[in-house]
Amino acid sequence: LFSYFCRKNLKYMMSNTDIPLILISNDDGYMAPGINALVDMLAPTGVRLLVCAPDGPRSGYSCAFSSELPLRLKPISRKDNVEIWACNGTPVDCVKLAIDRILGGKMPDMVIGGINHGDNSTVNNHYSGTMGIAKEGCMKYIPSVAFSSCYYNHDADLSPLAPYVRAIVAKVLDGGLPRGVC
């Protein structure tokens, strides 16, 4: 992806470097296979990935945020172009804390929710923490998408999604999304 971006001489907002920064979260927790599959799909492309996800499952939290719970961030790992943090809050808390605390108020080039284990189509998207992540990014005018798998089984093979995920991410980073659309 990164070499493609360089060849295209893109004119999108960059976060301190010429390498795009993507903020990733989910509602299944930072150890869930879906978010790790997403990182594995995108890390080889050369983009920088900041993962800030709940410290455990938070499915069904939609756009909820914590108003009374003291929130904590815990660094998990940092390797090459991937940095992983855990948060004791909701998926939306993760996005807010990543931008405000980890990035010091700087906006990432893109926000991604997922890969969710389970369908988020139709009415389900109103309850989904994965969709809440994309909505939070959208409200901050950051190009945002969410990926979900119809497979609820955490052992599901998500590798067939890789070409689609990479193509969608490249398209969004290349041309953005209309303001307020996720």
Describe each model-derived feature in a short phrase.
Residues N16-D18, I22, N36-R101, K106:
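A cross-family phosphate/adenosyl-ligand binding-site feature
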Residues D28, P57, T90-P91, N116-D119:
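Short glycine-rich anion-binding loops that position phosphate/pyrophosphate groups of nucleotides
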Residues D28-N36:
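Short acidic, Gly/Ser-rich segments with clustered Asp/Glu that frequently serve as metal-coordination loops
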Residues C138-C182:
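Glycine-rich, Lys/Arg-enriched anion-binding loops that position phosphate/diphosphate groups
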Residues M110:
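Short, Asp-centered acidic motifs that coordinate Mg2+ and/or phosphate
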Residues I133-G137:
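Hydrophobic/aromatic ligand-binding patch that stacks against planar heteroaromatic rings
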Residues D119-S128:
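Glycine/threonine-rich flexible loop motifs
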